[in-house]
Curated annotation (Swiss-Prot):
<dbReference type="InterPro" id="IPR000836">
    <property type="entry name" value="PRibTrfase_dom"/>
</dbReference>
<dbReference type="GO" id="GO:0004845">
    <property type="term" value="F:uracil phosphoribosyltransferase activity"/>
</dbReference>
<dbReference type="GO" id="GO:0006355">
    <property type="term" value="P:regulation of DNA-templated transcription"/>
</dbReference>
<comment type="function">
    <text>Also displays a weak uracil phosphoribosyltransferase activity which is not physiologically significant.</text>
</comment>
<dbReference type="InterPro" id="IPR029057">
    <property type="entry name" value="PRTase-like"/>
</dbReference>
<comment type="similarity">
    <text>Belongs to the purine/pyrimidine phosphoribosyltransferase family. PyrR subfamily.</text>
</comment>
<keyword id="KW-0805">Transcription regulation</keyword>
<keyword id="KW-0808">Transferase</keyword>
<keyword id="KW-0804">Transcription</keyword>
<protein>
    <recommendedName>
        <fullName>Bifunctional protein PyrR</fullName>
        <ecNumber>2.4.2.9</ecNumber>
    </recommendedName>
</protein>
<dbReference type="InterPro" id="IPR023050">
    <property type="entry name" value="PyrR"/>
</dbReference>
<comment type="function">
    <text>Regulates the transcription of the pyrimidine nucleotide (pyr) operon in response to exogenous pyrimidines.</text>
</comment>
<dbReference type="Pfam" id="PF00156">
    <property type="entry name" value="Pribosyltran"/>
</dbReference>
<keyword id="KW-0328">Glycosyltransferase</keyword>
<dbReference type="InterPro" id="IPR050137">
    <property type="entry name" value="PyrR_bifunctional"/>
</dbReference>
<feature type="short sequence motif" description="PRPP-binding">
    <location>
        <begin position="97"/>
        <end position="109"/>
    </location>
</feature>
Amino acid sequence: MTPKQLMNDEEIRRALKRIAHEIVERNAGANLVSLVGIHRRGVPLARRLAAMIAETEHVQVPVGELDIGLYRDDLHSRGPAPILGRTILPELGKRVVVLVDDVLYTGRTIRAALNELSDWGRPSAIQLAVLVDRGHRELPIRADFVGKNIPTAKNERVDVQLSEIDAAQDSVVIVQED
């Protein structure tokens, strides 16, 4: 099946701008907020959110990267050795950490991120921002900030393309799998 575009670059930009405003509003400013992108596509999304917050609030929000490769509960089914990225985190203590990811699906990625984050420190609070929430949760996890809710079937896949990673124009597409 041909991929169906659900969001274009302008719709993604608007959704991220709204999320940035919601983060600031929910936390009474951005002075104690850190953004942590989940490797891969959560990282550029976190950087974009930080830039948008800096633009309106004139505050430099620390941005970190979290690679959950060794914390996944499906390591045994992913092949002999996971490909690991890097984890670089700002100071966590007494800060609100907003985890950032592209798509929220079963909740297992977020569970792994929470487990790894707790190994690095204890923030005052953890919130979750996602560009797309597609439903079908297997764990009791809910995003605090959502760009767009997109109901999907189990045999569909939501793909996010970002210019920083995919060398393509930003888009969100849905693809039916066989």
